[in-house]
Amino acid sequence: MKKSIAITDEIYQKVIEHIHVGMSEYEISALVQYYSIASGAQQMSFDTIVATGERTALPHGRPTSRKVKAHEPIMIDFGIQYQNYQSDMTRMCFIGEPDPKIKEIYDVVLKAQLAGLGAIKAGAKGKDVDKAARDVIEAAGYGEYFNHGLGHGLGIGEDGEGPTLNSKSETVLQEHMMMSCEPGVYVPGVGGVRIEDDVVIIDGVGVPLNKTTKDYII
């Protein structure tokens, strides 16, 4: 699993080195696919999500011919299957400084993700981990725009393994469980932000396995 995630980190770094103003979402998605297969992936974990500008308000926006502009958000959410282990990561990036409103949303989502990561531990319930992140977003006034659960299980197979992190999950987290932690805020007409890491519980606490930076200017 660690190898799958490490390769995912490497793929993202290669992709963002090529992103430029005027590049289409289709082209970015194609780069993700190319570097994934070239790096040894069996296949993608799911259809790659690439959205730019106001389209980032779509939580699962599939790529289009829309072209990248400076200062606007670029959302890339992808994962690979490597030796049957599935990875899943989301990062935001910008060419130049982001619009102040999107930067505000980014900072809220990052704070929420850190709260969620801190709540992942053996013995915690899935709903309590979700609440830790959701409380941050609600306190910032964006609660209505976080419209999915905090995370899902990861591992072997199409649906992965492990717990679901949402407001109704009674699952008790246990040692070695793998899960994603991916809060998001999606404001129609403005844009959206999601930040996602893959996490494993080791010695009772959640350990993020992704090494990709969350510094977003490329």
Named regions from a protein language model:
Residues 2-218:
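Active-site neighborhoods and metal-handling regions in enzymes and metal-associated proteins
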